[in-house]
C-alpha cells in the first residue's frame, strides 16, 4: 500500500483502506500473467478479513466497469491482453444491438441487457461469446473505449410534468430526461438538439440539456439540419478559417503564375452537370501524327491555397469530403475557394496541376507526366450540350465551332478506352438515378430518371486514366500516398450472391475466385431484363466497400493494380493529399530538399497516411449515410401525397416479415408486410429469397413484378407501407451469359471469346494498363527523362503564349 500514489485519497474515503483501482491496474500491467484474488491479496499486502472483503468488492466493481476481466481460471486480467475485440455499437429500435468489428463479416449480437452499458455509436472493447438460442454469435461489453459524445436530435415531449426527448435516430432506443431549467423554451413536439449530461446505465435514465431548438415545422431544410447533427458532420466554419480566407482575392496573384507552364491558349474545357457550381477538372485531346492521342487533364491546384498546418487545412481534413444533399451542399472548402479561386471557371486564369498523357490507338497508356501550370478554360460545357454536339446538333456545333473537332477527338478516344476497359474486364455500371425536382416550398414536385450518356462516360474515362497515372507515379517513387482500394469480394458474399442468382436462373462464372470480367459478363447478359437495375444493386451489395489506404491492394471493380483519387481536390481530401505528394516528388526530382515546397508540396509519413486513410474512409461513409437519410425523408414526404395510389414495381428484397418493392421510375422502396398478404402461413426461404404460402402454394420471389397500393407513410421512421394488388412471375434464365454466347457461336473452334480476350492475370489482363516492361530498360529511362518536363508540343504552346502576352504588354506600355 505504501507505493500507492492514491493512498491518501483512499484513507479519506475508507476507515480501513485498500489499494486504489489505479494501483491495481498498474500492478497487473507489470505482471506477466493474470492473477487470482488470493495472489493479489498477498502481492498487495492485504491483511485481515475486512480488507479482503474490500478487495473482493473492488475487483468485482472493476470487472463490472470493464477495467478487469474475470477469466474461466478464476483470475483477473487486463482486457487488452485477452482475446477481446474492438468495435462500434449499432443500436436497434427494439433495445438490442450489434457490435460491428472491423475486418469481420458478421456482426456480433448484443442483448438488451448488454445495451444498457453502451449506446449506439460507442466504440467498445467486447468479449465474443457463444451462440444464443437463435444461433446468433453474442458478445459481452467489457469497456466503453470512446463514448459517443455527439449531440442528439429528437422531439421534446412532456408527460405528468416531466420533460423528455425522444431521439430521432431509432437506433438510440432510450428517452432523455430534460430538467425544467434546461429546456431553452422548447414546446411540446418541437425538434431540438440535446447534449447528454448523464449517459443511461442499468439503473439510471439518460439526462441531458437542450442546446438548440430547431422548430416544429419539419421540412427539407430541417431534414438536412438533423442529418448534419446526427452524423456529426462539420458545417460551421471556425473563426480562424474565416479570418484566413478573408485575405484571399478574387483573382490569381501574378506571383503565383511564375515558373508554371502557360497553357492559357490550349483549348481546355470543363464538362459537368447543369447544376454544378465548382469545376475542378478540364480536358483537351488531340490526335497524334503517328497514331493515338495526347490527352491533357488539368485539375484545380487546391494545394497551392490550402496548406498544412493552417486552420483551413485542419477544417478541410476534418470534413474529409463535400456532402451533396439533394437540396444543398456542405462544401469541404469555403465558397471563396470552391466556387472561386480554385474553380476552373471560363475565361479566367486559374492555377492547375496537369497530367499530360499519351494513349495508343489500342487504348494503351503509353506515357504520362505531371507539372504545375496556369490555364484559362475556353468554355463551361455541360454533359447535355456535349452529347447534343456529338449527335449533330447544328445550332450548338455553330455556337462552339472552334471546339467541335476537339470534342470529337475526345469521343473517339473514349470509344477506344471503353473497349480497353471491356478487354481488361473492368465492371461498367449503367446506373439510372433519381433526380428530385423541387417546388418553391422545397418539397419534391416530381422525380425524374437520369441516364448517363457518352459525354458522362468520356469524362469518366479521362479521369480514370489520370487517376491511374497518379497512382503509378507515387507508387514508382515509393512515396506514401492514399490509394483507392477495392478488395475482392469475400467467399461468403460470392456464395450468397450465387444462391440468389441461381433462383433467378442466372449464373456468375469464374469458379471459386470470379474475376472482374466474370461480373462484367453477368451484367452484360442481364442488361435487357426488366430487373437489371435490381440485379446490379445486388451485385454492388455483394462487393466490399472501396476505402482509402496507403497499402496498395488494387481496385477489383475497375480491374486495376494501381488506382488513386487525383481529380477532385475541391471536394475530396485524399485527392488534395495526392497533389501534395506529386508536387513534392516533382520538386525532389529538381534537387529540392525538405518536406515542403514553395507551391504547396508536402511529404507525408506512412503513419500519417494510415491515419488519414481511416479518417477519409469514415468521412465518406458518414456523408453517404447522411445524404441517404435526407433522401429517404424526402421520398417519404413525396409519398404522403400518393397514399391510396397504385404503382408498379419489382420485389427488391425478401425477408421473414415480408418483401420490399422498388417502384418503377421513382426508385422508392416500401414494405409489403407478410400480415397483409392472403390468409395463409408464409415460410421464408433464405437461400431461394422467397416467401412460400404453406396452404396456397403462393410464392413471392426476388425479382417478381408486382402492383401495389400505397397504404401508409411513417415520416418519423422513414417507412412506406404497401399492400399487394397483383404479382407476376419474374423471368427465369432470360439471356445467356456472354461466355455461353461465345461458346455457342464458336462451336468447332479451338477458343471462345474468353480465350481471345484475356489471359489469366491478377486484375490487369490488358497490357494497356500495365507498367513499363522491364525488358526494355532504355525505353524506361527515356520515359523517365521525359516525365521530368512537359512535352515538346506543350513547351511550344507555352512559349508561343508567353511571346504573345509579352508583345501585348509591350504595346500596352
UniProtKB/Swiss-Prot annotation:
Residues where N6-acetyllysine is found: 544
Principal place of residence: cytoplasm
Residue ranges constituting the RNB domain according to the UniProt record: 260-587
Pfam assignment, any one: S1
Known EC number: 3.1.13.1
Gene Ontology cellular component terms for the protein in this record: cytosol
Sequence similarity: Belongs to the RNR ribonuclease family. RNase R subfamily.
Name used for this protein in its record: Ribonuclease R
GO molecular function: exoribonuclease II activity; RNA binding
Reaction catalysed by this enzyme: Exonucleolytic cleavage in the 3'- to 5'-direction to yield nucleoside 5'-phosphates
Organism: Shigella flexneri
Function text: 3'-5' exoribonuclease that releases 5'-nucleoside monophosphates and is involved in maturation of structured RNAs. Required for the expression of virulence genes on the large plasmid of S.flexneri at the post-transcriptional level.
Residue spans of biased composition, Low complexity class: 792-801
Segments for region (Disordered): 733-813
PANTHER family the record matches: DIS3-LIKE EXONUCLEASE 2, RIBONUCLEASE
Subcellular location: Cytoplasm
Biased composition (Basic and acidic residues): 737-749, 761-774
Matching CDD domains: S1_RNase_R
UniProt-listed NCBIfam families: 3_prime_RNase, PRK11642.1, RNase_R
SUPFAM superfamilies xrefs: Nucleic acid-binding proteins
Compositionally biased intervals (Basic residues): 775-791, 802-813
Complexes and interactors: Monomer.
Biological process, per Gene Ontology: mRNA catabolic process
